From Swiss-Prot:
Part of the 50S ribosomal subunit. PANTHER family: 60S/50S RIBOSOMAL PROTEIN L6/L9, LARGE RIBOSOMAL SUBUNIT PROTEIN UL6M. InterPro entries: Ribosomal_uL6-like (IPR000702), Ribosomal_uL6-like_a/b-dom_sf (IPR036789), Ribosomal_uL6_a/b-dom (IPR020040), Ribosomal_uL6_bac-type (IPR019906), Ribosomal_uL6_CS (IPR002358). This protein binds to the 23S rRNA, and is important in its secondary structure. It is located near the subunit interface in the base of the L7/L12 stalk, and near the tRNA binding site of the peptidyltransferase center. It comes from the Bacteria. Transmembrane segments: none annotated. Keywords: Ribonucleoprotein, Ribosomal protein, RNA-binding, rRNA-binding. This is Large ribosomal subunit protein uL6. GO terms for biological process: cytoplasmic translation.
């Protein structure tokens, strides 16, 4: 039995869970999330808990069991608390600004990069070099944060670029000076 999959998910107050076939709909204070799960896994609501079960011990069923439970748990957490991901910009002249609903990045390119957040995603810029991506869908929050990071990933020599707040950038030593004259 999957250690993660067999744990029931408790439904907090103010959250409504509706399961039709393999489509799970979760309504809460922050909004509504709907996701279609794999038809092999059974999802049921039993006395203020969501229980995820699998029909057999086939490798596919076993791998989907924990995944489905985690996806449903993330939906419940998303409509109650929401998710956020912070990014830091390291480098001279690297800055972010919000113009309307667009995020404008100055990351050393010949032009400012404009990114439009996905639907249901909110972007905050508390400082010029800090970006916070918020939303109730964990997958979309992570995808948009990755989209921002992709514009200028951190480089290993000076660490310049856009990195996640808790990301550790592996640093490399630079070139050592060559002797005068060199090889002949």
């Amino acid at each position: 039995m999957s250690r993660i999959g067999k744990r029931p998910i408790s439904i907090p107050g103010g959250v409504d869970v509706n399961i039709e076939g393999n489509v799970v709909t979760v309504k809460g204070p922050k909004g509504t999330l709907t996701k279609e799960m794999h038809s092999l896994i059974n999802i049921a609501v039993e006395e203020q808990q969501i229980v995820v079960t699998r029909p057999d011990d086939q490798p596919l069923s076993r791998s989907l069991h924990g995944l489905t439970r985690t996806l449903v748990a993330n939906m419940v957490e998303g409509v109650t608390k929401g998710f956020s991901k912070s990014l830091d910009m390291v480098g001279v002249g690297y800055r972010a600004a919000k113009q309307g609903n667009k995020l404008v990045l100055s990351v050393g390119k010949s032009h400012p990069v404009e990114l439009i957040p996905f639907e249901g995603i909110e972007v905050e810029v508390p400082a010029q070099n800090k970006i916070i991506v918020k939303g109730m869908d964990k997958e979309l929050v992570g995808d948009f944060a990755a989209e921002i990071r992709k514009e200028r990933p951190p480089e290993p020599y000076k660490g310049k670029g856009i990195k996640y707040e808790n990301e550790v950038v592996r640093r490399k030593a630079g070139k050592t000076g060559a002797k005068k004259g060199g090889k002949k």
